[in-house]
């Protein structure tokens, strides 16, 4: 394919503007369909018949309308009348894509031509071959003022731009971004800013953005739906912040339900439900905290009482041990006195000789525990 393009380099358009448009696209990546010479002749005849008005202008399932052949920079087809007709027949394949008029024949600027290309690629015309017929009529009408070489170069530029846009699939997305530039460039597609005119971009940047925005255009289109109404979700949030500032947590808890309902007159139902839920949550939290505090306080009281009781028990134990020691001492003393008294009296008499005798039974009766 590269050798064929190199051989036909002499037939390429020589206009600087046309070459600038063509250089913006990598023509080597587009596949060129190889067709026999006999098929080219049949297709050329079919194009001449359609241009003459002998066939219907709507596309039909014919060999010349189903698959448009690839652009050829070959010699003029036999039987053509003028050079302008020859150039238009060489590029009649472009009618398979969304049609455009010749911008130079209508006096369009290059920016207007690119804008028309983009708009027409998004809204194609109903007739597939109407553009070719109108192009011939306009070429015949403007034949005296527009040279044939410029007509051919303009057709080549238009065909190259349409082919690149169709291959990249970026023309519809670019059109969407052009009509809705405020949707944002989040997806990467090139859209004009608010203050820029649609045709103010340079021709090279406009054509490159038309061809290269296919990858990011989808993302931008998807993000446009989410950015259409960013203020709807913020309205409720603003009201919520306002009421949160108006009622503090302490006021919500201490305020009666009747007073709260009076304060919330005219407020949306969602906001009322949210504030009441917040009030219920705060009251439950306060109730749980108070219960926890009471439990902790009661535990501290019980622990203090327990410590006091333990101290009393220890004191009582100490008293018991002291009393036991006293008892043991008195018992030992009693036993000594009893043994000493019986030894002194011995067998002298049965009557007691001293008053200690009367003390022993009484002391023994009181000390027995």
Curated annotation (Swiss-Prot):
Q: Per its UniProt record, what Pfam families does this chain match? A: bZIP_Maf, Maf_N
Please share what else the UniProt entry notes about this protein: This protein is synthesized as an Env-Maf polyprotein.
Q: Where is this region: Leucine-zipper?
A: 302-323
GO CC, any one term: host cell nucleus
Please state every residue range assigned to the domain named bZIP: 274-337
PROSITE patterns per the UniProt record, alphabetical: BZIP
Name by which UniProt lists this protein: Transforming protein Maf
Low complexity biased stretches: 194-211
Q: Where is the composition biased (Basic residues)?
A: 173-183
């Amino acid at each position: 394919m590269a050798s064929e393009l190199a051989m036909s380099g002499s037939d390429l358009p020589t206009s600087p503007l046309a070459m600038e448009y063509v250089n913006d696209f990598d023509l080597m990546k587009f596949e060129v369909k190889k067709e026999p010479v006999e098929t080219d002749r049949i297709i050329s005849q079919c194009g001449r018949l359609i241009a003459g008005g002998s066939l219907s202008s709507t596309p039909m399932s014919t060999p010349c309308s189903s698959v448009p052949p690839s652009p050829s920079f070959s010699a003029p087809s036999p039987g053509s009348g003028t050079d302008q007709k020859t150039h238009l027949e060489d590029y009649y394949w472009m009618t398979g894509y969304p049609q455009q008029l010749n911008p130079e024949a209508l006096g369009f600027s290059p920016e207007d031509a690119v804008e028309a290309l983009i708009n027409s690629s998004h809204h194609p015309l109903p007739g597939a071959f109407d553009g070719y017929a109108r192009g011939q009529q306009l070429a015949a009408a403007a034949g005296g003022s527009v040279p044939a070489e410029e007509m051919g170069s303009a057709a080549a530029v238009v065909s190259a731009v349409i082919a690149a846009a169709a291959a990249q699939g970026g023309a519809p997305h670019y059109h969407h971004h052009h009509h809705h530039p405020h949707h944002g460039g989040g997806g990467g597609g090139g859209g004009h800013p608010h203050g820029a005119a649609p045709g103010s971009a340079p021709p090279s940047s406009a054509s490159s953005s038309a061809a290269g925005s296919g990858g990011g255009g989808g993302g931008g289109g998807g993000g446009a739906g989410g950015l259409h109404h960013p203020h709807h979700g913020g309205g409720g949030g603003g009201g919520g912040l306002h009421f949160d500032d108006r009622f503090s947590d302490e006021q919500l808890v201490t305020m009666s339900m009747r007073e709260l309902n009076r304060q919330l007159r005219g407020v949306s139902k969602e906001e009322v439900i949210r504030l009441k839920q917040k009030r219920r949550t705060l009251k439950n939290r306060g109730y749980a905290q108070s219960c926890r505090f009471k439990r902790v306080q009661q535990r501290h009281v019980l622990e203090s009482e327990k410590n006091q009781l333990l101290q009393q028990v220890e004191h009582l134990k100490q008293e018991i041990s002291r009393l036991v020691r006293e008892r043991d001492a008195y018992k030992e003393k009693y036993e000594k006195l009893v043994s000493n008294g019986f030894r002194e009296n011995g067998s002298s008499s049965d009557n007691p000789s001293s008053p200690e005798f009367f003390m022993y039974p009484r002391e023994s009766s009181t000390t027995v525990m």
